[in-house]
Amino acid sequence: MNYGKIKKWNQMSGWGFIEGDDGYDYFVNVSNLRKGIKIREGIRVKFDITHGQRGDEAENVSLI
């Protein structure tokens, strides 16, 4: 499990980036959020990392 904060979030498009505690940025799509959570820039999250078309991506994103 990885931890970080929402660095950028585009509510209209449903995507953004998580700044991981490891210093890397991870692309995140609304489809990779745990069901029912609402996010905004600056909140802390936990997530798994997968290798997608855009490089490393966050999945199973949930609030902490």
Each predicted region: which residue ranges?
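Beta-strand/loop nucleic-acid-binding surfaces
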Residues: 24-37
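Short nucleic-acid-contacting surface segments enriched for D/E, G, S/T with interspersed K/R
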Residues: 34-46
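Structural detector for short beta-strands of small beta-barrel domains
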Residues: 1-10
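Short aromatic-glycine-enriched beta-strand elements
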Residues: 13-18
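OB-fold/S1-family single-stranded nucleic acid-binding modules
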Residues: 50-64
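Residue-level signature of catalytic and energy-coupling elements of molecular machines
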Residues: 4, 42, 58
